[in-house]
Amino acid sequence: MKMNLVGYEENQEAIARAVAGIEAGDFGCALIKNNVIIHEGRGKGVSPLLELAGTEEGLKKLEGALVVDRIIGKAAAMIIVLGKATHAYGLTMSKSGEEYLQAFGVETKNNRCVDAISDRTGRGICPMERSVMEMDNPAKGVEKLQETLAHLRSKSS
């Protein structure tokens, strides 16, 4: 019978590898199942998680996974909840992200908890965070995040 390793303790080796990879800049987030990294998300911000949420295959990977991410705010938290991940480990996590995850039964851990996730200039709130600040429904939140990302990308091109 195959063991199902789901907690932080049972997955600590894979978590250590994921944290090292994120800190080295090799990837931005990782999904872990049974102490194995099953997915490394490349890209900035929430885009790697958002890409996963956009496909059936990606949602299957998220389901029951332990998500390790550089930054987990409410935006990432909504994707994690929609994908039915069971655990979220943020190198940095916002209070609103942590509260949202816990409200949906996702176990959380972080190296640092902050009041808010800043934008890339460090002078304001992240636009992805701002777009879902007042939302609670994960499916509607992820839809809003996809719209916001498309809008931000169209402005920068």
State the predicted function of each range.
Residues 3-91, 111-131:
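Conserved mixed alpha/beta catalytic, RNA-binding, or beta-rich assembly cores of soluble enzyme
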Residues 5, 83-86, 96-157:
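C-terminal binding/interaction regions
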